[in-house]
C-alpha cells in the first residue's frame, strides 16, 4: 500500500491513522508543494491524496477521494461497525466531523492576519455548536468510543479534526467538551499502535 499526499496531515491523515490502527504497513510518500506542478499531470484527477494498492498478482489499483479511501480501508478491516445501527452512528459522526472540517478549511491558504481573523470568527461561531453536537453523539455510545469500545473510522476522523481545531487555538478545548477529551484518552489507550504513531508524528504546517 502506498499513500501519496503533500507533506502535511490534511485530507490524508485519517487514511494514515486508519491504516496504522488496522496494523497495515504502508509507504507514506510526501510531496513538497514546489514539486507539485511537475507531479500533478501524473496523478489521476490531479488531486491528492491517492492510494495505490498492489495485489498478489502485481496489479496496481489506484484510488482517489480521501473519505472513500478511508471508508474502503475501514470496511476491509472491519472498522465500520458490526451492525446496521453501528454503521449509521459511524456515518453520522463522520458527517458531523466533516461539518467541522468545512469550517476549518476556510482558514487554509490565507495570509497570517486574515487566517487569524477567520479563525476567531469560526471558533466563536459555528464550531462550538458543531463540537457540542459531536459530544451528544459520544454521550449516546454504550462505551468509551463512538460505538462501544471498538476503534472505527469515526474515532479516527474525529481526532484528526480535533487536531485541526487545536492548530487554530491551542487553548480552545481547555476546560470544555469533556466527552471529546475522554474519547481521545480512551482511543489511544485502546489502540497502542495509533498512540505510538501520534507520539512520533512530525509537526507539519497543516
Swiss-Prot record:
The keyword Transferase applies. CDD domains: GST_C_Sigma_like, GST_N_Sigma_like. GO terms for biological process: glutathione metabolic process. Signal peptide: none annotated. It holds the Pfam family GST_N. It catalyses: RX + glutathione = an S-substituted glutathione + a halide anion + H(+). It comes from the Eukaryota. The keyword Transferase applies. PROSITE patterns: GST_CTER, GST_NTER. Residues 1-81 form the GST N-terminal domain. Conjugation of reduced glutathione to a wide number of exogenous and endogenous hydrophobic electrophiles. GST isoenzymes appear to play a central role in the parasite detoxification system. Other functions are also suspected including a role in increasing the solubility of haematin in the parasite gut. This is Glutathione S-transferase class-mu 28 kDa isozyme.
